[in-house]
Amino acid sequence: MHEVYDKWHIISRDSYNYDHEQIEFTEIDHIVFTGMGGSGTIGDVFSSILSKTNIHVSVVRGYLLPNTVDSNSLIVNTSISGNTVETLNILDSAKKKNCKVIAISSGGKMEDYCKKYNVNFRKIPQYHSPRASFAGFMYSLLKILGPILPIKQVEIKESITELSKLQSRIHSGNLLDDNLSLNLAHKINGIPLIYYPHGLNAAATRFKNSLQENAKLHSMVEDVVETCHNGLVGWERPSSIKPILLQGDDDFIKTKERWKIIKEYFQEKNIEYDEIHSLKGNILTKLICLIYQLDYSTIYCAAISKIDPSPIHAIDFVKQRL
């Protein structure tokens, strides 16, 4: 798996530079990103990118479309394997509701369905596993959806440049003290609870998922502002949970105030916590680099525990019974 992660910057560059056919849809007022696991994270990232537009964005992890979709809705169906049953169900529903539809996968049943019913389809290669293929699919979609995205090409290229710089520090050939991902992996213990601010939920959720799949660890996520209204009370009892504070470079001023208060509370209660800070830059750069750094930390975490990060036997158990 680490061989693919070492090439994420190259995969990202090549995927974005590839001559993908871009969408030509117009009059879109609602975009629904559908997908499970890593495909769902792609939707989360696009939701952040589109958050300052007038387009309503939904991210669906499951079988059902919102009842509000219509002919002005674009349904972006992503299944890296092409065989995700939930996403296939939504693809069929979207076609029947006369929505604008595009499907993206490495092949599988999704490709067969799109050929049979003449649905817009783009085929993207899978690298190793769906979760390791995130970068290729993300940057391919940035190209495919380009006409409707507010992000500039220079910002996309900036994110790839920063990804390359980060790779030089965290790749598998660097096991020294300046490897941010390896350092974090050594600190991960107990049950990680990842606190995140508005705008970085995609990175936090992806980190949780990667800890579960790669490191085989339970983990949780909480919005830092919301936890001040409920979750923080849980720390009044001893716990094996380990807080990790995922902070943005330019968090809202009131959110920064919450971070300060929570750290003060943890220090007063002698609760150890770790801090992770995003890079400066546009939202894509922040999210992609955080996801890369945190994903790699889960692979190192697995290696430290002498666990193979690749197999996902529990998920195989479920799929065999569907």
Say what each PLM segment does.
Residues 26-168, 186, 248-274:
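Glycine-rich phosphate-binding loops that contact phosphosugars or nucleotide phosphates
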Residues 3, 7, 41, 45, ...:
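Conserved active-site and cofactor/substrate-binding residues in soluble primary-metabolism enzymes
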Residues 59-62, 217-228, 272-281:
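A generic structural motif
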Residues 2-4, 10, 19-23, 27-30, ...:
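Active-site phosphate/pyrophosphate-binding segments
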Residues 233-313:
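C-terminal active-site/capping subdomain that shapes the small-molecule cofactor and substrate pocket
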Residues 17-18, 54, 144-154, 215-217, ...:
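Short helix-capping/linker segments at secondary-structure and domain boundaries
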Residues 311-322:
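A short, charged, Gly/Pro-tolerant segment at domain boundaries
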Residues 2-25, 66, 157, 274, ...:
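Conserved, well-structured ligand/cofactor-binding cores
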